Amino acid sequence: MAQTLAMTSQFNGRKRVRKFFGKIPEVTEMPNLIEVQKASYDQFLMIEEPKGGRPDEGLQAVFKSVFPISDFSGTAMLEFVGYEFDLPKFDVEECRQRDLTYAAPLKVILRLIVFDVDEDTGSKDIKDIKEQGVYMGDMPLMTTNGTFIVNGTERVIVSQMHRSPGVFFDHDKGKSHSSGKFLFAARVIPYRGSWLDIEFDAKDIIYARIDRRRKIPITSLLMALGMDASDILSTFYNKVTYERDGDGWRIPYSVGRFKGVKLISDLVDADSGEVVAEAGKKLTVRAAKALAEKGLKAVKITEDDLLGSYLAEDIVNYQTGEIYLEAGDEIDEKALKILFDVSADQINILDIDHMNIGAYIRNTLKVDKNESQQDALFDIYRVMRPGEPPTMDTAAAMFHSLFFDPERYDLSAVGRVKMNLRMDLDCPDTVRILRQEDILAVVKMLVELRDGRGEIDDIDNLGNRRVRSVGELMENQYRIGLLRMERAIKERMSSVEIDTVMPQDLINAKPAAAAVREFFGSSQLSQFMDQTNPLSEITHKRRLSALGPGGLTRERAGFEVRDVHPTHYGRICPIETPEGPNIGLINSLATFARVNKYGFIESPYRKIIDGKVTTEVIYLSAMEESKHYVAQANSSLDAEGRFTDEFVVCRHAGEVLMAPRDHVDLMDVSPKQLVSVAAALIPFLENDDANRALMGSNMQRQAVPLVRAEAPFVGTGMESIVARDSGAAVSAKRGGIVDQVDATRIVIRATEDLDPSKSGVDIYRLQKFQRSNQSTCINQRPLVHVGDRVEKGNIIADGPSTDLGDLALGRNVLVAFMPWNGYNYEDSILLSERIVADDVFTSIHIEEFEVAARDTKLGPEEITRDIPNVAEESLRNLDEAGIIYIGAEVQPGDILVGKITPKGESPMTPEEKLLRAIFGEKASDVRDTSMRMPPGAFGTVVEVRVFNRHGVEKDERAMAIEREEIERLAKDRDDEQSILDRNVYARLTDMLTGKIAVEGPKGFSKGKKLDNTIMGHYPRSQWWQFTVEDEKLQSEIEALRRQYDESKEALQRRFMDKVEKVQRGDEMPPGVMKMVKVFVAVKRKIQPGDKMAGRHGNKGVVSRILPIEDMPFLEDGTHADIVLNPLGVPSRMNVGQILETHLGWACAGMGKKIGDLVDLYQETGDIFPLRQRIENLMPDNDHNEPVRQYDNESLYKLALQMRKGVSIATPVFDGAHEADINMMLEDADLDSSGQVVLYDGRTGEPFDRPVTVGYIYMLKLHHLVDDKIHARSIGPYSLVTQQPLGGKAQFGGQRFGEMEVWALEAYGAAYTLQEMLTVKSDDVAGRTKVYEAIVRGDDTFEAGIPESFNVLVKEMRSLALNVELDDARELIAQRVLSDTTEQ
């Protein structure tokens, strides 16, 4: 015991301690979960880098690519020098409140150089240089949590997955042609510029397409590059020299040419004349080699064998210059005769055998009608710009701009690297245009594929798909803005007097600022952040979307793109993806994955050296990984880190195989590296079916933060990581001592990282009842007490859905799996009333209501309490400014903000005249446009914000809010000042105590030794007047004083800045004079119709809330909280929920045992049994807390935490096994079956058989019945059709559709039907008449013509069909009249 206490370790109760079931040690830490966003944007802005030393990346690269800009005449040039950011005008919190964008002003330093141009020689001399900083709009900044604040709302820029630039080879899988023949194609995809496709057709002719236009023969493209026919042939084919030998031809023998060939005629040695192989024999590789080894140098062939070959060079009469045969011509009988006539002794033939080498290029050349570079260029020009007549210059310039101009074409570094790798080229990644060699290499490789050599690419491999994160997306967007600006600058440079202007005069930054604003405001990838809970925030930031500009579309994406690919392992989660049309197109990054500088996703692996697994970790992309043999993280190792099995299951080149252990060179880092954050939070994920796991990981993101968060008993160990990285829980920036704590802020006196230039105080403002994007409640609660010592990174406050620094999305509830009177039929959920009474699943939702007073044509609107025709009762909660008080309880129809709007003059009725005479002007010329609570909404007002335009007088309420805010700022300043004083004067006291002072304040006698008593006689401010003998110490004291004065000034300056911001008027949209926002909090208890779910995809709707006494109960009288249907488990195959139930039961049982021992300790003071129980529960290993080193107090704190239920962690794929669960149940003295006898709450009788009971973690999802239930009597109508609107948001009605009409027809309910189709829908006159009849107490009314009929008539008239309505009765009367007159 003494030994245990000797090496004590403290436990402060501020974190949740879990028993770990994982056996695999973590060799590397998980990277920060929002690093993807932060790193990418930091790399784009490079704020920290010095102005002159920034590398050419991100924003710097954009400016470098657009500048310098010269004018059209070349007399002036605008150069880019550098850029810098000023401090943002408002901080994050102020931007949120004022609906502003959190951004910093961007200042670009530009240099304008003016030249003197000599008209004769054209030489330039510098005449003038002007440098100036130019404001280029605001650049949005990222918050510490990886989000952007745009117009006051938090947004996330989702990373995009797109096909990597480079070259790709593929075939059509035999689908294009009826013969089923594979047509091969290559595609060169640049990052920016024209796509080049090279493809075979069914006749094996090779064509090129530029930007998917009309195809042209590939030889035309090669001619346009400056090659002629013989160049093309000599590039793609070898020559074989045939020499005439008597009546035949002699050709050199090569193994490559003859191997695998079936001989048509005898093979004759040209030197000896003997037959070395007979006709009909197939030469194997071995036989062909054997002939060469025997000394066969050349063979003789007959004239007939020459037929079908192709000439490599022209056959020319050198005297006359006549060409008898051209290069590429096929040798037929006629050609043989010509060869005989011109007595050619030696000819060069193309090495084409139609087996190993095909005649595709030669055939394409023969099909191609173009014969020169000019023809080819003209042909390409006509394809790209049809209808324009080409000239040689324009055609050449246009062709050059397609692939060879860095302005128009950019492969990017990635594209060049991929191209080099694929085709074994050696070209630096700074060359980002296409070269002639690249195009030739692509054609050669395509021909090789057609000849059966090489492999096609898999476009779904993650080596061929890359991620574009925030920084890169923003870079592309900003480049577009700058290019728009470039045109305007060029024009302006030519039109102004260049000698007198400054850079500022040439630049209009609007296009660049507009591009940024457009991207953040309306891009498909800039999304409203999902802020339901911390997990949904983190997942949103780690999302990878294949949609968006330059990506796929839902309709065109096939099955292959959406499917899970072997390379996803450890990079993209195979589980978490939405159900529905986006399945597989929106993915989530795996837990350990990161994105490298080229945009490829990398996963970490442990290195294996000499058969021993090391702790060295390397990150590899999918391309690099395919070369290695990778073992799984759970492969069994011995104590030295060597594999125990002879053969190890591993992955290699996309396949899973058993490899000998000495082949294996890498190993996974962790079993959870293949899943995403949300999937890694599901315990026993390995026991759930994949479809249900998908639902589980998606539904955790919809869990509403509850009033009382509770971490799960059965966790996975990921909970604390998510809470920390999401920023929901507040962690300490520096170590220190807690100085003050209240509900709204924590003040910590720093003891580490003390930088003289920074304050020695950290003030953490906690968010209290703030509204999230999804209207859930963000509320932070302090965990520390005054005097507590905290270390850097410690959790000091819990946020929404966090409990002691662990993610807590739901609650642990006692579940019984059994049917109960049909109330859990079809996944319904039966709940106990205790859940409602104890607010177990109660959540707070905050709704925001906004009202603006505008300046209208008829006069300004006014926010006031003086509203016409409103009873005083309705105004009881409004203050004198007409704004509701904080704390007021409101219900549907209540006025939140009183507002009146002037209305136009209209003729007055006698009543109005009377009112006007009595009450004066006000009563008649305004109407009530107050903001009222919408139907179905109840709650309490928690916050009011008032915004005024500059120069508009503030009302009393605005002044009160302002005063409150300034008091809060002053309190912060005073607290920081007092801690600063305390620290500085403590240091000064240390410096002066015991020293002899040679000078001092008035009344001090020199030469005395200073101590606390002497110094206590003088006010602290006079201590600085003491001067000591030691000069070095005196200079230190003076430095301290200077630093103190500077800190005080900086503090006061900061305070004054903030006060000035508070007092300054607000920037308002045009026409708005004043704006009021009211926040109403609603407490939502759980009720029938709400959706709930577990973590395993086990979702359901609450069907009934049963009184506690009627719920099934255990032997000790404990009632179940929730009853689930056992039939929901087998068919869904999510057995994880059952294992969680058993383990949760064991946790609660163990907690009860510990609780009993805590009570024993409190009674007797004997802690030994408690210590023994906890030490047995938490054996010493790498994962568990070192409880053996805890002192008694720490152990007691831990036991108090555990008595509600022991928290455990069972990591995915490395969690508790059946045996572990059995052991836990036995330790807690529970039946190892996990089943108990339950009693019926209504009869008290035991149920027939034991029931599975335990604790399961249930979530309340954001699909609440209160948000969905809706009823309407009268409401708005559509303007055109005059029919009622639909949907809750529009306060619409239920549609009486076609089928419902049939039902009424079937019943013969003619009058009801007529009513439905006219007066209850779109008969405008009829509706009014019905209302009047009801008012009169009448029940007679007449239906008129539905408005939709009039719409139909109007539509027919628009098609020039005149339709007129005639009164039937009149027509009949006329007809009767005419009949009678005829008679």
UniProtKB/Swiss-Prot annotation:
Assembly notes: The RNAP catalytic core consists of 2 alpha, 1 beta, 1 beta' and 1 omega subunit. When a sigma factor is associated with the core the holoenzyme is formed, which can initiate transcription.
GO biological process, one term: DNA-templated transcription
Catalytic activity: RNA(n) + a ribonucleoside 5'-triphosphate = RNA(n+1) + diphosphate
Name of the protein in its database record: DNA-directed RNA polymerase subunit beta
Function in brief: DNA-dependent RNA polymerase catalyzes the transcription of DNA into RNA using the four ribonucleoside triphosphates as substrates.
Organism of provenance: Bartonella quintana (strain Toulouse)
EC identifiers of the protein: 2.7.7.6
HAMAP family: RNApol_bact_RpoB
GO molecular function, one term: ribonucleoside binding
GO cellular-component term (any): DNA-directed RNA polymerase complex
